[in-house]
Each structure stands twice: as structure tokens, then as C-alpha cells.
């Protein structure tokens, strides 16, 4: 039976939406609920295709730190929670997905545009001055050498191994069985549950009820959000410039292709 509402009962709601490029907006909310509101539980609503490796790991670690303080964290997957977003989800106490949620995509991708042929056609050439053999690895102005390909593959392989190890540990999946689940393929929520990648199936309201129950709260406990940090026009413009810069430079990502 549902407990009666106790005045002051609250649960924190944190939303992770879109590509994961900057961890700070999400981590700021997590810290707020830990240090200011001191809530007993956080519902982490995820609708993201993944993103940068470092950013995903930053949020993953912050969720771990939140749980170490005794706060329950329930990950609720929306339309998509794949790759880096799945990495974040496995840090939670439990994961709930919709049957049709697109999740999984456990793997790493690094893409390097190559424009040397086009540049030659328009008569544009670059003089490169660098400090070491590999400093311009991934440059779009020339083809990639074989040793550079091997170097970058080693970076991708190690990053993938970190992801794989985290999944195996968090989901208690034997390494042998991980092979078939971590080739970058996507799964529906229902498939993911059958494979042990998520715990239960349900929507946002189901996850909210579960979070309240896990924290020992009544069904009427209030859902609260952290105050948003308003950015100035200059900060927003600077953020747009940074996004363009990241888009034009190479990075290793946990994301859908």
C-alpha cells in the first residue's frame, strides 16, 4: 500500500538530453541535489545518442559519487539512450527502459574527414610546421599514413576496453558473453532487458514510482528540478563557436554513427 505524503518529501529530476559534449550542466544539477537539496533519490532521465568519451565518463563518475553518499539514482531511458548515454546509465542503481527504447551501441568511433583531393582541385595547399611526427595526425589536408592508422586504432581499442570493462562490472556480465553484446550494435529496450543490459521496462511515470519506492518515499513525494544556470548572450555565442570547433576537429566518441 502507498504511504501517505510526508511534508517535505522530494525527489530530484535530472535530464540528460542531446549529444554529450559538456558534462557540467548535468553534473551541476547532480551536485545541487547532493549538496543543497540533499534529496534521497534522483531520477536521471536520459534521451541521448551518446557523445564524447571524456564527457560521458565525467557524468558516469559523478553518478558514482552521488551513490556513494547514499542517494538512490534511477536511470529512465526515453527514446534513445545509446553508447555514451548508456555508459552514464550503468552508473545508476537501476535502469528502466521503454520496450522500444534504442540503446546499446557499446563501442567507440573516431572519424577523420579527408579533403586533400578537393583542396588540390581548388588549388589550395597547406604548409605544416609541427613538433613531432604525429602532431598533425588526422589532418584533413593529407591522406593518413599506416602508422597513424595503427596509433589511432590503439587509442580506439583502449577506449573501447574501458567501456566494455565498465559494462561488465556494472551489469555483472561475464567477459565471454560481453563479446556478443559490445560490437557496437543497437538493441531495443526489450532486447536489452533480455540480455541483462537494463533491469526493467517502463516509462517515465513507472521509473518515478520506482525511484520513490527505492528511497522509501510516498507516492505523493514532490519532484523538483535544480535551478538552471542562465547563460549570457556572449556565453551562448561562445558555446556555439566551441561546438563548431569540436565539429571540425577529430575526437573519439561513444555515440551512434
Q: At which residue positions do the language-model features occur?
A:
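Short gly/pro/ser/thr-enriched loop/turn and capping motifs at secondary-structure boundaries
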Residues: 80-83, 102-106
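Hydrophobic/aromatic residues within transmembrane alpha-helices
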Residues: 88-89, 192
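Short, conserved acidic/polar surface loops in the N-terminal third of protein domains
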Residues: 55-56, 85-88, 107-108
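N-terminal organellar transit peptides
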Residues: 1-81, 94-98, 111-257
Amino acid at each position: 500500500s502507498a504511504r501517505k505524503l510526508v511534508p517535505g518529501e522530494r525527489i530530484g529530476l535530472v535530464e540528460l538530453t542531446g549529444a554529450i559534449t559538456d558534462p557540467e550542466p548535468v553534473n551541476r544539477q547532480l551536485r545541487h541535489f547532493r549538496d543543497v537539496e540533499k534529496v534521497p533519490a534522483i531520477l536521471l532521465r536520459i534521451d541521448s545518442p551518446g557523445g564524447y568519451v571524456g564527457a560521458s565518463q565525467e557524468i558516469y563518475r559523478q553518478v558514482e559519487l552521488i551513490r556513494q553518499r547514499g542517494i538512490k539514482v534511477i536511470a529512465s531511458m526515453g527514446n534513445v539512450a545509446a553508447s555514451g548515454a548508456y555508459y552514464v546509465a550503468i552508473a545508476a542503481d537501476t535502469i528502466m527502459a521503454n520496450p522500444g527504447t534504442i540503446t546499446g551501441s557499446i563501442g567507440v568511433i573516431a572519424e577523420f574527414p579527408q579533403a586533400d583531393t578537393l583542396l588540390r582541385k581548388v588549388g589550395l595547399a597547406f604548409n605544416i610546421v609541427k613538433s613531432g611526427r604525429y602532431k598533425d595526425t588526422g589532418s584533413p589536408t593529407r591522406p593518413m599514413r599506416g602508422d597513424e592508422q595503427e596509433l589511432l586504432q590503439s587509442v580506439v581499442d583502449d577506449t573501447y576496453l574501458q567501456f566494455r570493462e565498465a559494462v561488465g562490472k556494472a551489469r555483472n556480465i561475464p567477459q565471454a558473453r560481453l563479446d556478443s553484446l559490445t560490437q557496437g550494435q543497437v538493441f531495443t529496450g526489450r532486447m536489452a532487458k533480455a540480455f541483462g543490459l537494463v533491469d526493467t521496462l517502463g516509462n517515465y511515470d513507472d521509473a518515478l514510482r520506482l525511484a520513490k519506492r527505492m528511497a522509501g518515499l510516498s507516492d505523493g513525494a514532490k519532484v523538483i528540478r535544480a535551478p538552471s544556470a542562465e547563460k549570457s548572450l556572449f556565453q551562448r555565442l561562445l558555446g556555439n563557436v566551441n561546438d563548431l570547433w569540436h565539429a571540425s576537429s577529430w575526437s573519439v566518441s561513444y555515440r551512434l554513427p
